[in-house]
Amino acid sequence: SDVTLKDVSIKSDKDAALKVEGDGNVRLELDGKNELKSGANHAGVEKNNSDSKGTLTIKDDTGEKGSLTATGGAQGAGIGGAKNNSGSNIEITGGTITATGGCNNNEAGNGGAAGIGGGFNGSGTDIKITGGSRKPDGTSGCQGAGIGGGYGKGGTNISISGEDTVVNANGGKYGAGIGGGAMGAGENITISDGAHVTANGGAQGAGIGGGSGIGG
C-alpha cells in the first residue's frame, strides 16, 4: 500500500503516532515537513516484527523536499519496534529523516531504544539506507544503538549505500552508533558506494559494531 505524509504533525500521549501492520509492503512518501511523536512504550513510526512481515519503505520520490522527525516514547524506537519488540525490514530511499529512540522514564537512564531499529529489548535487523537519502539521522535514547538494536539486543544486516547518502548515527549510553545496543552485538554491517557515514558510540560502545560488553 502507498501512504503520503504531507505537512503532518501527530503527537500521541498513549499510542503510536503511526503504526504499520499486516503482511504487505508499505511505501511511505514524504512531502513537506512531517513530525510524529508517540506515547510511552511505542515507536514514532511503529513497525513490530510481530505485527508486520512486509517491508516499510520511506521515500521522497516527488522531489518536494520531504522530511520526517520521528520520536519514540519511553522505550520505543524512533522508527521500528515498540518496547520489547524488534524492528526489521525497514528501507529508507529518500527524505531527510531524524529518528530518536525513547529512554526509560527513570533518572538512572537504563534501558532505551534505537533511533532506527529495535525498541527496548528488541533487535534491529534488515535495515537498508540507499542512494538519494539526504540525511537520515538515528539517535538512541539511553542504551540503544543509533541504528540497530535497542538495549540488550543486537543489530544485524544493516546496509548503507550511495554517494548521495549522508547518515549520522549516535548511540546512547553504552550503545553503538550502528549495530548493537548495550550488551548487544553488531553483525553484517555494510557501507558501500561512497556513502557518507558518521557513527558515534556511547561509553564503551563501538562506532560501528557491538554495544558495551560486546565490543566491535
Which residue stretches match the model-derived regions?
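A composition-driven surface/loop motif
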Residues: 1-216
